[in-house]
């Protein structure tokens, strides 16, 4: 099975320009290819991971990746299938975000070894050197307005309004392809399926300006089996930056993937062989309640993104919280595992009587209910049941001198911080 056949078997090929020519190029020699990442935030997220891992697969097959950080295009904003124009960021912010994204990409691509080691480029380096007049003369003349208006990504915005700034975005992305081809002999661009219009602007410019053929391959935008856009947890993006989405939160995200999606996601997001995945699928279908596919998915992706130690920690947090063994976890581990739990910062004037604190921290709705909860054995401090109505919280209840975990019943948690 050649690399293109494997990508197809994994569900990673959505659309290509001349497929036969692309397969020929990928199977007959080394291809230099690029994927672009606009710094629209200070971190990449799971939605970027499909293209990143596809790039890694191609590198492992011997091809040479260029990771383009859009320091210039990030200042403009891509209109593709957006309902409204993005708010523009300052140059300083975009350049800062660009540097952070560069660091994240080095986790996935090999920038050190071999004749196909990855290269990082930033389109700010060339766009900052070209004048507006030169750009219109040397690039703009190759694009007709009719051609630009025909793009689906533009059509969807015409009725609501699109600025010239965003309208010109496709020409800028097209010029990226031309520049990388001219300087580095890059002949293939990879991106999400929503980028097709912008990407083919690059092949059009290559054809008209340099009489060369470029290839484009898009990866699918991933949705779950209900059609919901992939990569969000409770409406929030799942970030690759551990400070924005902890390894534990990422682990839980994969662990909660629906059965109908789990095997498909193993093909897309892991480097397990297709034979290994087929074996996992067989075991998974025989005992779905054991969630083997989800557990494997969580292990593989968290290890890939954050490393084996982070995976082991996420697994340990999961197991200890499930067992109620709060004291077996450090304060930092509890902050990860209970990040979505109500948090109350204890004030110096607060009463440390347990009944009072249950009301103050919003765990029980009233003192009467709080007393009943304590007497009925429904209140736990750091995993220990407390039934003393006169119990006073003390330093002994502080884990690592930072926090106390209170549980009411089986599932209602609150964290006291000091």
Swiss-Prot record:
Key words, A-Z: Aminoacyl-tRNA synthetase, ATP-binding, Cytoplasm, Ligase, Nucleotide-binding, Protein biosynthesis, RNA-binding
S4 RNA-binding domain: residues covered: 352-418
Protein name: Tyrosine--tRNA ligase
Similarity comment: Belongs to the class-I aminoacyl-tRNA synthetase family. TyrS type 1 subfamily.
Protein transport as UniProt keyword: no
Location in the cell: Cytoplasm
Organism: Streptococcus pyogenes serotype M3 (strain ATCC BAA-595 / MGAS315)
Its EC number(s): 6.1.1.1
Upper classification of the organism: Bacteria, Bacillati, Bacillota, Bacilli, Lactobacillales
GO molecular function terms attached to this record: ATP binding; RNA binding; tyrosine-tRNA ligase activity
InterPro entries according to UniProt: aa-tRNA-synth_I_CS (IPR001412), aa-tRNA-synth_Ic (IPR002305), Rossmann-like_a/b/a_fold (IPR014729), S4_RNA-bd (IPR002942), S4_RNA-bd_sf (IPR036986), SYY-like_C (IPR054608), Tyr-tRNA-ligase (IPR002307), Tyr-tRNA-ligase_bac-type (IPR024088)
SUPFAM superfamilies, per database record: Alpha-L RNA-binding motif, Nucleotidylyl transferase
Reactions this protein catalyses: tRNA(Tyr) + L-tyrosine + ATP = L-tyrosyl-tRNA(Tyr) + AMP + diphosphate + H(+)
SMART domains membership: S4
Quaternary structure and interacting proteins, as annotated: Homodimer.
Motif 'HIGH' region: where in chain: 39-48
Tagged with keyword DNA-binding: no
PANTHER family per UniProt: TYROSINE--TRNA LIGASE, MITOCHONDRIAL, TYROSYL-TRNA SYNTHETASE
Domain of life: Bacteria
CC terms in the record's Gene Ontology section: cytosol
Its biological purpose: Catalyzes the attachment of tyrosine to tRNA(Tyr) in a two-step reaction: tyrosine is first activated by ATP to form Tyr-AMP and then transferred to the acceptor end of tRNA(Tyr).
Binding locations of L-tyrosine: 34, 169, 173
């Amino acid at each position: 099975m050649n690399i293109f056949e494997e990508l197809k078997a994994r569900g990673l090929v959505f659309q290509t320009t001349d497929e036969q020519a692309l397969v020929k190029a990928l199977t007959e020699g080394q291809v230099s290819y690029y994927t672009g990442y606009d710094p629209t935030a200070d971190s990449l997220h799971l939605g970027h991971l499909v293209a990143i891992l596809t790039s890694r697969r191609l590198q492992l097959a011997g091809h040479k990746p260029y990771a383009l950080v859009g320091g210039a295009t990030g200042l403009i904003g891509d209109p593709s299938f957006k309902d409204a124009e993005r708010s523009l960021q300052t140059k300083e912010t975009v350049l800062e975000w660009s540097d952070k994204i560069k660091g994240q990409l080095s986790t996935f691509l090999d920038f050190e070894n071999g004749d196909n080691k990855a290269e990082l480029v930033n389109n700010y380096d060339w766009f900052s050197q070209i004048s507006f007049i030169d750009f219109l003369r040397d690039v703009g003349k190759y694009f007709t307005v009719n051609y630009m208006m025909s793009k689906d990504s533009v059509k969807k915005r015409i009725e609501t309004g699109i600025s010239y700034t965003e309208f010109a975005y496709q020409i800028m992305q097209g010029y990226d392809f031309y520049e990388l081809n001219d300087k580095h002999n890059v002949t293939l661009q990879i991106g999400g399926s929503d980028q097709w219009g912008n990407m083919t602007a690059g092949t059009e410019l290559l054809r008209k300006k340099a009489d060369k053929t470029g290839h484009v391959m898009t990866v699918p935008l991933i949705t779950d089996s209900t059609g919901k856009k992939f990569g969000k947890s409770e409406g929030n993006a799942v970030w690759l930056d551990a400070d924005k989405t902890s390894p534990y939160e990422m682990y839980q995200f994969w662990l909660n993937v629906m059965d109908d999606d789990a095997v498909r996601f193993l093909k897309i997001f892991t480097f397990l062989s297709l034979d290994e995945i087929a074996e996992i699928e067989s075991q998974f279908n025989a005992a779905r309640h054991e969630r083997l596919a989800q557990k494997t998915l969580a292990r593989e992706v968290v290890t890939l993104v954050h490393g084996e130690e982070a995976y082991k920690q996420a697994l340990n947090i999961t197991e200890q919280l499930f067992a109620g063994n709060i004291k077996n976890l450090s304060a930092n581990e509890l902050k990860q595992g209970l990040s979505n739990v109500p948090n109350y910062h204890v004030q110096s004037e607060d009463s440390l009587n347990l009944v009072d604190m249950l009301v103050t921290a919003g765990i029980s709705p009233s003192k009467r209910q709080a007393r009943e909860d304590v007497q009925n054995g429904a209140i736990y401090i750091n995993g220990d049941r407390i039934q003393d109505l006169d119990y006073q919280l003390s330093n002994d209840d502080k884990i690592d001198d930072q926090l106390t975990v209170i549980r009411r019943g089986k599932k209602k948690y609150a964290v006291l911080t000091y």
